[in-house]
Amino acid sequence: MEEKLSRRRRVVLVPVPAQGHITPMIQLAKALHSKGFSITVVQTKFNYLNPSNDLSDFQFVTIPENLPVSDLKNLGPGRFLIKLANECYVSFKDLLGQLLVNEEEEIACVIYDEFMYFVEVAVKEFKLRNVILSTTSATAFVCRFVMCELYAKDGLAQLKEGGEREVELVPELYPIRYKDLPSSVFASVESSVELFKNTCYKGTASSVIINTVRCLEMSSLEWLQQELEIPVYSIGPLHMVVSAPPTSLLEENESCIEWLNKQKPSSVIYISLGSFTLMETKEMLEMAYGFVSSNQHFLWVIRPGSICGSEISEEELLKKMVITDRGYIVKWAPQKQVLAHSAVGAFWSHCGWNSTLESLGEGVPLICRPFTTDQKGNARYLECVWKVGIQVEGELERGAIERAVKRLMVDEEGEEMKRRALSLKEKLKASVLAQGSSHKSLDDFIKTL
């Protein structure tokens, strides 16, 4: 028995090949590695992460799939993930079989991103323990469930029709409106629901890990626990649970830290819309005018390829944008370092879940401009539940942008949000310390292995 336990040490992890999913999966891997487990990370050729030297203790293996990069653009993320699942199932099963034959260590469990749902079917054939990792919020998980249930009852008319009806509240999901449900700008409601049916299916999963904190989402976690009828572990924020090396798919420009060093405390608004958001040229120019008119210092991340519908190059567009010496623009930034910097007083964000947790973890209030899917619900919670955010809705217009920036950076309302954000920061810090809820959840999960 002792020999069997000592060999049951390897954990296999399967992330979605996207920045917002890879990062928390690697953070979880680091947490498990710190507890004595060996780690194997299964990647696709698409968006392959070139591991840093800090991850040299991890084994990285690749599923041989043949999806062209153009598929993501042509199909949209939802349909692309469905195609990826169909493409990877057989090769993943073969790879898993090889791991079982070749490895000296037994596999304790396979942890897969909920959107890599094909893993559950493959793992089941080998009778291995499998665990779902949700890299979105618990509330987003609930919303996906509810969308599937409403769709089955033809109850998503408000979302399909748009207009005034989409601002109606979803029954029993206050303060979520129909427009806040995690539908995608890249896909129809029907396509989104098709994907969510797969992600919400627990199959033979023994448990679910969610990158969240009980103090933020207690009611959603309790809802999921009752609905799924398997243990739900809130182990987050994962970036605070353990120190992990950068896993950025884009090169980070650290010159912005030197620029921040020259600014006054809480005087800079950091602007970043994530690794996937697309913007029209007109929107980008309106943002530039709004930020400059606010008379606030700003650090702005403009990702290559993020401006669509432009007849001129991004370099030419940047020249057209009247940026004063109060502004600093980079293509990509070391976000956790930026948010932790004393000069940063606010974050204009797309409200992806990682960005949301990183901002709350540093006590930085947000201006919320969600783009798609779960970002909309996150923004709603930031504004209406946690009260540390201001949502900018509708068409982007320079006056509205200027007013939002001043509300957060100048007005008393912003000071109150900052105080609430700092209070949440302390609660999140406490959750990952010994006796904290997330620390206990991680220990409880490890005991099951």
UniProtKB/Swiss-Prot annotation:
InterPro entries: UDP_glucos_trans. It comes from the Eukaryota. Coiled coil: none annotated. It is an enzyme of class 2 (transferase). UDP-alpha-D-glucose binds at residues 275, 333-335, 350-358, 372-375. Pfam families: UDPGT. Gene3D superfamilies: Glycogen Phosphorylase B (3.40.50.2000). Its EC number is 2.4.1.-. GO terms for molecular function: UDP-glycosyltransferase activity. Keywords: Glycosyltransferase, Transferase. Belongs to the UDP-glycosyltransferase family. PANTHER family: FLAVONOL 3-O-GLUCOSYLTRANSFERASE UGT76E12-RELATED (PTHR11926:SF1494), GLUCOSYL/GLUCURONOSYL TRANSFERASES (PTHR11926). This is UDP-glycosyltransferase 76E7. The lineage of its organism: Eukaryota, Viridiplantae, Streptophyta, Embryophyta, Tracheophyta.
